């Protein structure tokens, strides 16, 4: 029996033997396609090739592409674990022709691989094919050339309510490349329910699609017209998990070797004996998606891809909880996964430590709120009406306890309940509106500035240039002329001003003529043109005017030093912390550099010191900074780091500082690292789960920062009458003395409180034979209240004690009840009721509880209420 890894390799070997280039799987994070959340098909990495926007050095390709379908348009998450074939992560085997072969070869390649004894050797009678209803060419190839009998070929027409809307017609979008497709189905046999494709029973488990071959032969225009493409292409996809199920003679993907290994590993970790438990399937599926997403640079967060990852992890953790998990377990599956995935698991092995750290941290974080959230949900489920959980409760679980909506839906599904999703969305919308109301945005010129052509940037080597004004925009609209005093955006035909990109801020400076001065405060890119944003301080300017554009040189030099230092910092972080470090955001300004990066745990002081030492060592080495322009493939072979989420063209700019740092970058840089002068880290901390931020200063700013630190040190030493070298020792002595004094003071306060308590014993009232003390206290700290209550309870032996005090305009309440009375008078209930009287809230145990409030004027009423409440209970 062939393993999954053997089937994967045989597919690639077969198509390599047919002249195809084996192309590695692309990242799950699409590199050049903002329309996609995750890579979800083999053709994603070739999209620009099919559109004619990119050329590759080959016309035939084959891949084993890792894919994720969770979130966005293609979302299989809610079905995972409940069906035989839904997964969050899967592998799509594919072969592609870019204007090379077409239908004849594509069909015959597929049939040979599936049926030849040298390859998969499937029984021909077990295979059925579908073709688009009018695709006679494909039908004839299957029937007359391949030899598939007519009763095994099915024509499928427009079955989705519109022309060319069919299971057998594929389109990239409403316009663009499209064409008919032919699909191959495997018959699992009569023991499974289901009908042939196109029949009412087609959704059954008997006939399963294993391969889809798309013939891109048309270009659909906006009016619906179909034009023939000059070079038709082929895009195919064979689901590896489905084909493995066929080859291993099982009907469910979860019965195949990879999933069975993972399921048994989970069962062993959690001591589960029933291997058919759906939660085992969920966990086995989710560890694949989570591990590969983290390996490809995604970190759990509350936005975009990071939130989808968080949702999958939390769903897995919840199902682990159902299986009896009492501690973090999910991360322990990574080594087994890396092994069982074979060659495709190498990326997991390389990043195993990082993946496990990230998973463990996220699992432990969610575990802290999981039990409380489930308790709230269980309580809410007992009160549902019309078998529907309210959107308000679902939103509270999401907002307060971190429950993704699909996790709550999972629990409801198990109880045959639904969620009021409209109500949930209403709560989400209200929250977004509140957030939007708190923001204030100025004029957005992105949709306003429309200028033919492009701005040529000549600022790498020049800080001043002659240019022509080709566009003017003021008050949100295009104008021909601006006058003195007007704020505007000026577009030039060429410019030395750098527009904000890649984290580097835009340049400032001056645009001038002999009689006009326009102060440039910022430079931004709008499409292909650079916008110089500022104010005209004298004269007037019109479209067509010749001007001198001058960059603020001192500011540019400072920005440039910070940008080069950022590259050194990035490499130093990877050297000290590990290769998992990837840039997640940056700011390069004249005053400071800020760098956000993936890192699952806090960074120690010694690590920060080592990072700083490495950067300064590279600065002292005065390394020549090299800048080369080359094609993207050559840059990658050179080892250049591409930044997560950035889009690069075919030709890229590579900035190198020997082998220590090589990055793709369009920013400005120093000529030698010595020009940076000095590097000093000034802050480090977390900005989100799995994301840390460091800030640093360089050159003159770093020297000024050190001067200020020295000044603070000297002033502190003078104030404490100590030498700066013994300052730490002096502060430690003062701290120890302060702690002793504070302890002595607290002991005195407790003694006074005990004395006051003895006086209060004499003032105890009897209510139905029970000792009751209800008092408003003056000048008593909150810390002492509990001591006083405990002393009174001990002295009276059987009593109810209620104290109220005011400090800093806030009310503090405490209720103590001896254990013999706590079944009648619950301290938590009483203090909660009192808190409402003073505009607050609180609670606690039946024998001791505290609360606070913001309305001290109502304290007397609250104490009177307490007496009446106690009397009613007794």
Curated annotation (Swiss-Prot):
Gene Ontology cellular-component annotations: cytosol
Gene3D superfamilies linked: 2.40.30.130, 3.10.310.40, 3.30.54.20, 6.10.250.550, Bira Bifunctional Protein, Domain 2, Threonyl-trna Synthetase, Chain A, domain 2
Cofactor note: Binds 1 zinc ion per subunit.
GO BP, one annotated term: negative regulation of DNA-templated transcription
Keyword flag Transport: no
N-terminal signal peptide: none
Record localization: Cytoplasm
Pfam family, one: DHHA1
Enzyme type, top EC level: ligase
Source species, domain of life: Bacteria
Cofactor(s) needed for function: Zn(2+)
Domains as described in the record: Consists of three domains; the N-terminal catalytic domain, the editing domain and the C-terminal C-Ala domain. The editing domain removes incorrectly charged amino acids, while the C-Ala domain, along with tRNA(Ala), serves as a bridge to cooperatively bring together the editing and aminoacylation centers thus stimulating deacylation of misacylated tRNAs.
Homology family: Belongs to the class-II aminoacyl-tRNA synthetase family.
Role: Catalyzes the attachment of alanine to tRNA(Ala) in a two-step reaction: alanine is first activated by ATP to form Ala-AMP and then transferred to the acceptor end of tRNA(Ala). Also edits incorrectly charged Ser-tRNA(Ala) and Gly-tRNA(Ala) via its editing domain.
Record-given protein name: Alanine--tRNA ligase
Gene source species: Actinobacillus pleuropneumoniae serotype 3 (strain JL03)
Lineage of source species: Bacteria, Pseudomonadati, Pseudomonadota, Gammaproteobacteria, Pasteurellales
